[in-house]
Amino acid sequence: HAIASQKLSLWYGTFQALYDVDLSIREGLITSMIGPSGCGKSTFLRSVNRINERLGYVRIEGSVHVMNENIYDPHVELIQVRKQVGMVFQRPNPLPISIRDNILFSHRLHAKGGGEVAQGTPDEIVEQSLRQVLLWDKVKDCLQRKATELSLEEQQKLCIARLLPVKPKILLMDEPCSALDPKGPEAVEE
């Protein structure tokens, strides 16, 4: 399985957000989680790449296996989890640096640590990633522009493009179109 949780429970302080979640997702499948607002979908996704642990008041019991490895085992390095499990959030979160540097940021970080990353010159990596999200033609002449100056749709596409050079095995998308105008989802889905 690509993802398998076993008896996963999570608390924010004294509030229990997840209760004994057992879920298995096979590799290679596109899977959707559907449920009412506040039922724990985002909390579960954030548990799969350990973003919840940034908050000092989160406690987790149970296990989450990604590609058959318990990502909460003490020997598992966070940087390797984030390389395997990319995430796109509800609101775009480009780094406040250039469009070009946004694409190359995680590639540089993960290339140093070994493992599979996109090959090629930095310019080739940037172009390929932006072409894959249909953003290249729009930004190719302004790659030094600050990423935060792009429209919301463009920022969200950039956030997806930023993951591609790292070649994550799993891509989590937490309602990536919810903050966009009505035409935005179509552009991101393309």
Task: Locate predicted features.
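ABC-type ATPase nucleotide-binding domains, specifically the catalytic core motifs of the NBD
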Residues: 50-56, 74-76, 93, 101-121, ...
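ABC ATPase NBD Q-loop/coupling interface
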Residues: 63-80, 144
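Conserved ABC ATPase "signature" region
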Residues: 66-70, 119-141, 190
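Conserved ABC ATPase signature
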Residues: 146-150, 154
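Hydrophobic anchor residue at the start of the ABC signature
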Residues: 160
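Conserved catalytic motifs of ABC-family nucleotide-binding domains
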Residues: 167
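Catalytic Walker B motif of ABC-type/P-loop ATPase nucleotide-binding domains
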Residues: 171-174
